[in-house]
Amino acid sequence: MGLTRPPSLPYPGSMPMPPVPPVPPTAPDPDSGPLQPRTAAEGRIAILTQYFATDAVNHGDVASFPPPIALDELPFAERRRLLDGLLTIRPPRPIDDEDMRDELDEMLANESAERAAEAGDPDALALPVLATTHGVAGALGGHVALREGDLTTLRAGAIVNAANGQMLGCRVPGHACIDNVIHAVAGPGLRAECAEYMAGRAERGEGPEPVGRAVLTGGYHLPAGHVIHTVGPVVDGGRVEKRHRTRLASCYRAILDTAQETGLDSVGLCSVSTGAFGYPKEEAAPLVLETIGAWLAAHPGSELRIVICAFSAKDRAVYEAALAN
């Protein structure tokens, strides 16, 4: 591929990077020169980091952060984190080098499969429903499952992304929001499709994506076939008003309508607006369950499996408390 030892490039060491799968530590030896890849995966990380670091500098995506570090002297775990950050801040422009596109696709596909396998390859249709796990009666008990774990490992017709109005991902390296994680696992193809959608809005004289709707895209390297994006309400200071409740309910209705109308068999839900958008989880959970129940009552023939994905045990407990009440 004509790749040579990279020059010393600015390393954004002050930028927090997302967590990545653990890599056996490689202790750098200042007298040994460049670190040599030991596996095909490390070789792929090496060439991709070089390519996207050079791409970022050439296009002005990154500022100079001292001190300059030669990329091939970084341990591979650090290079992978750096690559994650470079992809996070990268605008949705084409990847011109076909070899690099193929290498990136191969890396992301392998990592996504490994993440799913480590999580037990969860399948939305195979998860026990609330009737079994929590004794919930009616349509809610028969159609809905509650799962604790990483939404991006779920095999489903679609998973839900809590997007912002620009629809291009979080763009902040290391930020742990679901928007960032979904784009990181899915890969640049997702941002490119979202950019195309937003370009269409701009051509029609429309602005940011409104709150309370749903947009369907491909899933790319996610186990899920699609992503349903929704922009939730922003709650300042944790004070929930009627308009916030109305808009959050609209998000979930739009998600379920989109899944049903598209003919999906299942959808994995994240907790919309409860992160950086400030909606208290304890107030959101009962509203989510109520909205799902009302939607199921209005669609008695639906066979849609709905999986509520709780990120942590604490989040799961919030939903279980709402179910108990």
Predicted region positions:
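Macrodomain-like recognition of ADP-ribose-binding/processing modules
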Residues: G2-N325
